[in-house]
Amino acid sequence: MGGALSGLAGSAFSLAVPAAVIGAVHGGIAGSRRLYPWRRWQGVTAFVLDHTWALVTSTASLLSHAVAALSKDTSFLPNLSERQSRHVYVGGFRMRSGFVVTLGNTVSGLADSGEHRSTLVTDHEDVHVWQARWFGPLYPVLYVAWMVSGAAVGL
């Protein structure tokens, strides 16, 4: 389903085949982990956005999945992922030790699965997941602009 929807979205830019492949891989991972809560509007909305408007950030999330698959110190957290419309990993892709990274709908780099970390995911990182969905291909540009302007103000 993800591949077909992404292929349809990609056809608007003559990228139907690569978009369909990315959507199929992303959708396959999400489906195998029962990621989306199909009986709630948020789950359907998340799926549609992840495979259309936010396909760029969903593509980036595949990097997190690849690193997680190749890392020995990584574990998937079903309790924070299943029917939550997001993938969550202890360990995995990290830009800096001690920092959590959200790429698309994938949260990586948690130090542990304790209550404090769970709250971080549900109260903070989930906001980034939904920002990536709502802003779609604009999100990476807006995020970098926010970081640059914050750094400039901090100087």
Positions of predicted regions on the chain:
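Active-site recognition of the HExxH zinc-binding catalytic motif
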Residues: 120-132
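Terminal accessory regions that mediate trafficking to/through membranes and regulate activation
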Residues: 105, 118, 145-148
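Generic hydrophobic alpha-helical membrane-segment signal
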Residues: 38, 93, 112-116
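Short pre-active-site segment immediately N-terminal to the catalytic Zn-binding motif
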Residues: 100, 107-123
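A residue-identity detector for tryptophan
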Residues: 38-41, 53, 130, 134, ...
